Amino acid sequence: DILINNAGIFSMGPMEVLGEGNLRRQFETNVFGTFALTNLVIPQMRERGSGRIVNVTSAGAFLARQYMAGYAATKHAMDAITIGLDLELKPFNIRVCSVAPVQYGTSIADNTAMPSADGPYGDQPVDHYKEWREIASGRSDLSPVTDAIADAATNPNPKQRYLVAPGTLPIMDIFDAKVQFDEERWKQT
């Protein structure tokens, strides 16, 4: 049995402007929705003695950027849940993996409203949004992401995290090093 959790919503803008309700909506979909679906399948997977759960997170789980803090917080929460669940469920032959793409052009970009230029932040959130949309729109080949999801779902020895970046992004070197350092340090404690 395989469950792939890929639902997500994203709001861009200053935290104080987006407000608590917006942050709660992001957590409801990105974290609690995934959590609920996952909890529905775990008993059946455990009963069958195997299973695979793949959570599509985001590089934003580790690389929070301005005007994206709420989204990053939800993806960080999902990454932590993914790693913890993988450790809990491994004895039952159930693996839980995360696939963390970096800014690909998906429907999440189409469903994200441009922030307002009104208020104390002026045009900064709008400029940031336009830059983000431009980068994402140039990355429409999702095959690296779907390949990572397929590997996470079917590889007998999957990685806990699949970091997926289009081409070569220097930031991924920093990202890979940070994740590896954190994992190595954790194993030593």
Where in this protein do the model-derived segments appear?
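Active-site loop-to-helix junction immediately N-terminal to the catalytic Tyr of the SDR YXXXK motif
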Residues: 18, 64-72, 84
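Residue(s) in the substrate-gating loop at a strand-loop-helix junction
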Residues: 58
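SDR active-site lid
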Residues: 91-159
